């Protein structure tokens, strides 16, 4: 610390000496102040260039645009040199803080068209880390948000802004901690609205730029209410009544719709409409895209896809499956094709996957040179997969806009690509009509039978061996049929024309699963716009609610005017309610249809009000107190009590022996207290709910095995006496024993018993050990006796320890009749070694001499 202070003091003195040289010398400015002045001058110059910029007829380089040096450097390092048409048209007015509504074909570079103005606006505003949130980009899918974030990181790496992703898939608390440090936020609408509503301290009032990327897709996914709420949170601030608001809004999409125009009116201020498409060619196809379609029966679509994959093993393609809970169908195709080993890397992507899995698949497919991605429409918008050769639409798209965005994953910017759509025979005419309305030319091709696969037997084997594949097939079948059923354009999607049995058989299923389709009103016929349909639905709901309220009031008034009904009517109401509950549990269509018809017939003569099953459920009364027959019984008892006195006396259970017995006041008070206590005890002993208070359903449930087990007492443990065999309760006997003696006495008695048992057991163990020792000694003596007998015998010796000549001479005859005696010399040698070395040596010499003599005599 001292050294640092000394150095600082010397530097200050030197600066002071330098500053005092000469009479007219000016004080020196600090380096950071000079830097700040330089930056301010650059910003002023840049702002004047932006305000006075007149775009030329054609912009060929990014350097021609009035942008900061940091942005120019980031574009150059990312190899972005030449702007696309949408970029050259949208960036100049966006730099001047104009609201933009842009539309261009897929793959035309709309992302840079809003990222560059976003960075420049914050740079001109001198936005810093302490200023909070300055720009928000809203994307329809997580993958598109991640791609936008990576693009922003590449071109804005020389700026000092902090950017972040809020797309879900992570705990909300972690994202809340990062929100306060972000200058640029890229988010999906659902999670962003959740943070705007629930995160404390999330200030969104200072936002300068709001971007809606792929806005039509946001509306298709049902995010219109969320977008309206988000726009209301980011409300622009106007300095004067006629001035431009401080917030700039950029809205980009490949296609336009009426809902998009309504959203533009809500969020944009005097927007500038920019479109790179020719008049009447909204959403035109890329120039290098080749489009084909083939007509294949529904049951042969997987065969056609398999044949296509086997004939294009070096391609990079995307297979789109119709959305609408189609994650199961994507999984079914992926799992079955994976087991067939196509020779091409397979991947699958859908909205039900976890966020890390989706990002991993997105990155792996982007970096692959040849692969096949099976996905839903989650990958149909905005995602820029490099070098995609083929886009195969296994199912018919929902509409032409979806078709445009799907095929836009290939032929990006100036590259070439091919799109193939596989249609059912019933979908061809309707889809050709829709293509003609958009001036899109799609050529028809015919797939040869030899080029198609035959997967029927393989699918059946998979479904038979693996229950998971069978289950996936069933769910895929149901989800596909339901997705066709809910489509709006019934001129294309005709569920009655689909061969359900053949389709199920092609997936390896033994038969078509039973499907419970919703009401036909849910599948609207092509006609009115979405706004008109929504208004009509809201009016119908309001009318139904009013009719239900009026009907319930009328019914209550009728009940009050008519009085109490009969017992039979109440039982019928209860039976109807039980039938409704049973039908809800079973879920059968036939019963529910019959009941609704009966309800309609019964409701026509009574009243025009609509009474649902929930209304009847809430109208049910307690069977023991509020029912008419119970109140009638109470009134009847009161009449009898008022009219006939002696009859009641005959029916009484308890009769008074003496009525003329007079008691004193104290005795009367005592007897009243005793009787009151007895009555209270009797009432307390009674159950709170009796069988009369319960409904038939409750009584039936109580009579079941499960209900009886609940009401019955639990099992008791019983011990039987060893001497008498008498049964006694386990816990009761334990309590009795505890009462008889204390714990110390019990321990003492227990230890004495155990000592006696151990003494007896010790004696037994000693006897057993003694017997074992005797047996071992007896066996050893018997073995020694056998060895002595063998030594004294005249059996021939098995082996010679002499020269080889004797051994070779004796090879011809066998001296040992059996190999058993060969073990005896070893045993004998061991015994002699135990006895001593000298005796063993003498014995061996005598034996050898005797053997040699015997051999010489024999020869």
From Swiss-Prot:
ATP binds at residues 104-111. Its EC number is 3.6.4.13. Residues 1-34, 512-615, 771-859 are annotated as: Disordered. The Q motif is unique to and characteristic of the DEAD box family of RNA helicases and controls ATP binding and hydrolysis. Gene3D superfamilies: P-loop containing nucleotide triphosphate hydrolases. Residues 814-823 have a biased composition (Low complexity). ATP-dependent RNA helicase required for ribosome biogenesis. Involved in the release of U14 snoRNA in pre-ribosomal complexes. Required for pre-rRNA cleavage at site A2. It is an enzyme of class 3 (hydrolase). This is ATP-dependent RNA helicase DBP4. Interacts with the U3 and U14 snoRNAs. Associates with pre-ribosomal complexes.
